[in-house]
Structure formats: C-alpha cells, structure tokens
Regions:
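Short, acidic/small-residue loops that bind anionic groups at enzyme active sites
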Residues: 40, 80, 96-120, 133-135
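Active-site/ligand-binding-proximal alpha/beta "capping" segment
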Residues: 65-100, 107
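Glycine-rich oxoanion-binding loops at beta->alpha junctions
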Residues: 39-77
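Short glycine-rich anion-binding loops that position phosphate/pyrophosphate groups of nucleotides
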Residues: 18, 42-44, 82-85
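Short acidic active-site motifs
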Residues: 21, 65-66, 147
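Short, hinge-like loop/turn segments at secondary-structure boundaries
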Residues: 30-33, 53-58, 120-127
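Glycine-rich beta-alpha loop segments
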Residues: 1-35
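A charged, well-structured terminal subsegment
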Residues: 69-72, 76, 127-154
C-alpha cells in the first residue's frame, strides 16, 4: 500500500507518531516519492513520539481535533487493519458521512479479512433499519491492492 501511495504521487495523512506500523507506512510512502502529512495530537508530543517521516505536520490539541484535521486534509479515508484508534476514526468518518459533513470516499482495506466482522455488522444494522444508509453508500471494501487502486482512482 505504501509503495503504491508514494509511486502514484499521492499524499498520506496519518497520526504523525513514530510508533508502530504507521511509521513504517509513512517512511515507505516518503521513500517512494509521496508526501506525508502528520497530524499530531499533544499527547504524542508529550510522549516524545513525533515522527520525522512527515513532510508537513499539523499539531492538534486532542484526538477530536486530529480527526477533524484528517477529514479536512484528506481526499479519501482508507482504514488499514488496526485497533481501537482505527475503529474510532472509521466511525467518526462514517458518522460525519451520514450527516453529509464528509463526502469523500471511505474504504476499508480488508487485508486478510480483517474487517469482515465489521462489514457484516454494518450490513446487519442497515438490514434491521438501525442505520438508514446501505453499507455500499457509506463505504467501499478493497480486499487487495488492485481493488484499492481502482477505488481510489474512480
């Protein structure tokens, strides 16, 4: 994913921390010619975890401000396999999308079936009328890099 982002001249907008998998992603994007925007909450600054991989950095007061900056600065939202923070970001973006405050493409990169249960849950919520939107209208699913490339090129 990172190599494709960089080589296709795209920009990665991410949390700006040097911890974890996203640091590797950011470094690889940059090594392959892409821009990297780090959106760094004060908590990351306080823990001295700010990455050097970013070409541009936005500092935010907190996680809510960070998510708002993600949405403002991004052309699309792609969720790679992740944990609680990723789920928080996914649901924040989907909630904004249902209120028509975020109109860009949302993609779950479903590597190894990571998002299968979440996809089923959203389909069930929609089928039961608990959310009015169909999943297909809220988000797309890419099961491999070719599908991700196609979705982001549309």
């Amino acid at each position: 994913v990172a190599t494709w982002i960089g080589k296709s001249g795209r920009t990665l907008v991410y949390g700006g921390s040097r911890a974890g998998l996203m640091e590797t992603l950011a470094t690889t994007v940059r090594e392959n010619g892409g821009r990297v925007i780090g959106v760094v909450p004060q908590a990351v600054v306080n823990r001295d975890l700010v990455s050097d991989a970013s070409t541009t950095v936005f500092y935010t007061a907190d996680l809510q401000d960070r998510k708002s900056t993600f949405m403002r600065e991004s052309e699309a939202f792609v969720a790679l396999p992740g944990g609680i923070g990723t789920l928080d970001e996914v649901f924040t973006v989907l909630a904004a999308k249902t209120l028509e405050k975020y109109k860009r493409r949302v993609v779950l990169y479903n590597a190894g079936g990571c998002w299968d249960e979440l996809i089923k849950m959203i389909d069930t919520l929609s089928a039961n009328g608990l959310i009015t939107e169909r999943r297909e209208d809220l988000l797309s699913v890419a099961n491999n890099i070719e599908e991700l490339e196609r979705l982001l090129s549309e």
